[in-house]
Curated annotation (Swiss-Prot):
It is an enzyme of class 3 (hydrolase). Its EC number is 3.6.1.11. GO terms for cellular component: plasma membrane. Keywords: Hydrolase. It catalyses: [phosphate](n) + H2O = [phosphate](n-1) + phosphate + H(+). The lineage of its organism: Bacteria, Bacillati, Actinomycetota, Actinomycetes, Mycobacteriales. This is Exopolyphosphatase 2. It comes from Mycobacterium tuberculosis (strain ATCC 25618 / H37Rv). Belongs to the GppA/Ppx family. GO terms for molecular function: exopolyphosphatase activity; pyrophosphatase activity. Signal peptide: none annotated.
Length: 319
């Protein structure tokens, strides 16, 4: 069987991301040959936590990005596409408007294509598959944490998922609910920590963190923390991928981000401008997870992967 060119699109609460890759015969299990990767911050989940609805302007931003992605599918001759919508799309009452838009835009490139909503369990499975495909077994079992805008997936396993939980907390949701001042007040940060612990509690009952040997962090908050810990003057995905961040360095960066203004965060060289207003919330989630992993599993280091649910989606198209 020849290689097949596939496209994966992950539409989350904060970003919409595209991967075009070759899969199939001649490649190792879990291996992809990247053709194109791209991320756009569209904040689809803007206000969803408060209103339960997608805002018209958020759908418009997402449509603009998806239209560009559809053109790239045609340009790169993608044969199959799978677009998944995660936390934000699970929570809204007007999601039919969103899915009709995706069918209209994607259908122009590959007829019959449209986004699909996936469960938290499916999201965890795809994130795990994308993250551990190239890690081998030396550091297993892995606890993979995919920290998104609206939810955080926590997954334990080696080659297959042993336990997983999708916690109803992410950097956008936490920021909109708790962190209203600029910079956040001590009271706001304290309230945010309590909410994070409350939302993580069922995950900690479900996923036996004490069995883990390696903590793998995915998505924009995690990769940006690695970039800052490495004092990068520009975002370098190759240097971030599989980087290891010592616990002390991780907590120092988190504390610094939480106390900064949005303008100060935006001025940091590796910071994506669409992430500056919510990464403080993400840093609080990371701090709480770091504490739990240190206490429960003795893990005091974060391994950061650039490969995540997007890679898992692409691999799912390989059969």
């Amino acid at each position: 069987m020849a290689l097949t060119r596939v496209a994966a699109i992950d539409c989350g609460t904060n970003s919409i991301r595209l991967l075009i890759a070759d899969v199939g015969a001649g490649l190792a299990r879990g291996e992809l040959h990247d053709v194109h990767r791209e991320t756009r911050i569209v904040r689809l989940g803007q206000g969803v936590d408060a209103t339960g609805r997608f805002a018209p302007e958020a759908i418009a931003r997402t449509r603009t990005a998806l239209t560009d992605y559809a053109e790239l599918l045609t340009f790169h001759h993608a044969e199959r596409v799978r677009m998944v919508a995660t936390s934000a799309a699970r929570d809204v009452v007007n999601r039919d408007v969103f899915f009709a838009m995706t069918a209209d835009v994607l259908g122009a490139a590959l007829p019959g294509s449209a986004a699909e909503v996936i469960t938290g369990a499916e999201e965890a499975e795809l994130s795990f598959r994308g993250a551990v495909g190239e890690l081998g077994s030396a550091g297993a079992p892995f606890v993979v944490v995919d920290l998104g805008g609206g939810s955080t997936e926590i997954v334990l396993g080696e080659h297959e998922v042993v336990a997983s939980y999708s916690a109803d907390i992410g950097c956008v949701r936490l920021t909109e609910r708790c962190l209203h001042s600029d910079p956040p007040t001590l009271q706001e940060v304290s309230t945010a920590r309590r909410l994070v612990r409350e939302r993580l509690e069922p995950a900690l009952r479900t996923v036996p963190l004490e069995l883990a040997r390696t903590w793998v962090g995915l998505a924009g908050t995690m990769t940006t923390l690695s970039a800052l810990a490495q004092s990068m003057t520009a975002y370098d995905a190759a240097a971030i991928h599989l980087s290891r961040v010592p616990g002390a360095d991780l907590l120092e960066v988190c504390q610094r981000l939480i106390g900064m203004t949005r303008k100060q965060r935006a001025a940091l060289a590796p910071m994506h401008p669409g992430r500056a207003d919510v990464i403080g919330g993400g840093a609080i989630v990371v701090e709480e997870l770091a504490r739990e992993l240190r206490e429960r599993a003795g893990i005091d280091q974060l391994t950061v992967s650039e490969h995540d649910i997007l890679d898992g989606i692409a691999l799912s198209l390989a059969g």
